[in-house]
Amino acid sequence: MERYTQDLSLLVKQIELLEEQQQKHYFFYNLFSPDPNPYNKAFEEIIEYLISSSEATFLIHHFEDFSHTLSIQQQKQFQKLNDYYLRHQFSTHCFHKPYSEALYTLTALWIKGLRGESIITLFPYLNLLREFFHLKYQKQLNMKEVKYMDVLKSIYGVELTEFYYQHIKESKASFLRLYRDYIETFPSEYIPIQHLNLSKEDTMTVLYDIIRIAQSVISKQTILINFGPNPFPTIYQNEETIYLNLGIFTDFVSALNQCLKLLGEVFILDYNHSATTDDKSETEQRFMKHSIIGFCTLLPLLTDSLTKVIVNRIFPDNKGDSAFLEKIHEELTFHYFKTNKVHNSIESYQPLQEMLKYFIELEIEEEWFDKKFDSLDLSHQWNLRIEQYLNKTPHSHVEGVLRHSNWTKGEIGVAFGKLSGYFSIFCSGLPKEPYDHPFSEFLEHFSGGKLRWWRPNYQLYSKLKMNEESYKCCWVFFKQKINHFR
């Protein structure tokens, strides 16, 4: 048995090295090319070669029968190996081609849509992809038929999925009312950009100051940031350095948003490589990823520490001026909420609007997966709900298809994860309120320049499990926060 577990670890290590090289390739492609990122199938082809070997097949069938003998870490390794095996097996069944070829085709068609070209040939592939998802999860969950909720439970865990799914559904009407009130009053209270119209150089200076605060968490690695010609931000790390490519520079607020999202990824990288995660499940780690990234994205709304960084670096003569600090903070939070689009990106960066798009994305993905409509109807379903919920016309007639880019990576349930992450931030009230908020310690260390003492451990995860009473506070505090920065 020991020999088999060693073989399993070695095989998974080879796969992880290939994944790392693939990530490196994507990062440097985005760094130098203005075009959307094509799918490089070479790495997946090598993985498919490893998976199709007699050794890999034997290990998979062996540990299917003896998975109870594996440690938690070894179970993670087996899950990774088995996931690749199922991808390869059912891709051949559904697409009549290897998984690498199928994803290459899906990605190429998605890129055509980004360029404004016809994607009519994508829809038959999406029907096949849905069938692929069903077969994969039927085998993985040992069920004859699977529903969308079954998949979410397998990805994020039963307890968290049931709790957040219920409250996401219950909160949709409240979010819609708040959004409509928000857009009705927003134009009349417009705050012009007077101080935050920063140059690319000044923006880089401020972001590096923020990075220095965060870097105390990753003491052994240097963090470097840059702007590239590609609109899609990427992250890459080696043993010495973490590289953050923020994409195209347009303005300070958008750059800050991208930087904070990638900082969330940095914390996750450190978190996943720490010893505390070895005995934790993949479902818990996935949930923590969305929670921490969501939290970092909303930092300008939760603390004035970022405003202090801006004033200290760009306006040093106004360091002690509390009125000036408040003015900058008001300008920052206002425009951080109102920013909508960045060039060719199909995401918006107004947090409230983006949350509502996640509501729509979740609804559509569930109905699509459960076969309530055909893939050809995806764009119509999206456009209908964007107009109904947001009172807006989509900037592209195929936006509803392009929003689900995670499907081209073989991923599902991302919108639910992001919404759950946002909800978890407010589960116990806001950090400044007299409640034990899960991220209070982070903000305390962040504000005091002592972030090196903070780690996102699994005590944090246990605190993020919402209970009924804390949920009742969530909506009230969130509404107060948005009204404050309206």
Q: Predicted segments — roles?
A:
Residues 1-155, 460-474, 481-484:
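N-terminal helix-rich structural modules
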Residues 103-254, 455-457, 461-486:
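Contiguous, non-catalytic segments that form substrate-binding/exosite surfaces or channel walls
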Residues 253, 269-294, 308-312:
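Post-HEXXH active-site segment of zinc metalloproteases
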Residues 423-464:
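An amphipathic alpha-helical core segment
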Residues 252-267:
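Short alpha-helix carrying the canonical HExxH Zn2+-binding catalytic motif
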Residues 410-429:
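C-terminal substrate/ligand-recognition segments
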Residues 302-406:
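Long, amphipathic alpha-helical stalk/connector segments used for oligomerization, subunit docking
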Residues 238-252, 274-283, 338-345, 400-407:
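Acidic/His metal-coordination segments adjacent to aromatic residues that form catalytic metal sites
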